[in-house]
């Protein structure tokens, strides 16, 4: 398995968008639309996990996430792994790749917004806040010092 950056203008962009659109996650249509329409800052990135040239998972590294009126940044978001590959530490590899990228940019901490309990803690994230996201659903905000 290999983790690669996927930029909107590279050869894997369409493959990534097709993977997102066809995935089982209920957020996938929103994520695909946002990724296609988003005006990326120079340092923001999307990472994809590849197995034999097939995308099996993804995450993004962005300035903002789905919770308004907070000063936290940057975020690792949209972490998803195909069901067939769960349990193989793909999400951990995606998150660690995003963290290494954040370090290379000089960031000292990263954040994740999630409703999952006891998931990101195993990767060293600590819940620091709770906020309602754009649909009004309460989400935890997790931080990891890097």
Label every model-predicted segment.
Residues 48, 54-64, 75, 80:
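Conserved beta-strand in the GNAT
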Residues 1-34, 50:
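Short amphipathic alpha-helix that is part of the acyltransferase structural core
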Residues 64-76, 86, 134:
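A conserved beta-turn-beta hairpin within the catalytic core of GNAT-like acetyltransferases
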Residues 37-43:
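Short loop/turn motifs at secondary-structure junctions and domain boundaries
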Residues 81, 87-100, 112:
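Conserved acetyl-CoA-binding loop-helix of GNAT-fold acetyltransferases
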Residues 108, 114-138:
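Conserved active-site alpha-helix within GNAT-family acetyltransferase domains
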């Amino acid at each position: 398995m290999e983790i690669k950056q996927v930029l909107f203008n590279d050869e894997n962009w369409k493959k990534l968008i097709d993977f997102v659109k066809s995935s089982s996650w209920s957020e996938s249509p929103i994520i695909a639309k946002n990724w296609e329409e988003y005006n990326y800052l120079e340092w923001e990135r999307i990472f994809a996990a590849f197995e034999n040239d097939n995308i099996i998972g993804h995450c993004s590294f962005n300035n903002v996430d789905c919770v308004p009126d907070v000063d936290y940044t940057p975020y690792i978001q949209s972490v998803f792994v195909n069901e067939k590959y769960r349990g193989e530490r793909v999400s951990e590899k995606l998150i660690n790749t995003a963290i290494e990228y954040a370090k290379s940019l000089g960031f000292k901490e990263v954040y994740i917004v999630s409703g999952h309990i006891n998931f990101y803690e195993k990767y060293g994230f600590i819940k620091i806040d709770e906020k309602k996201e754009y649909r009004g659903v309460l989400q935890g905000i997790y931080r990891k010092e890097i």
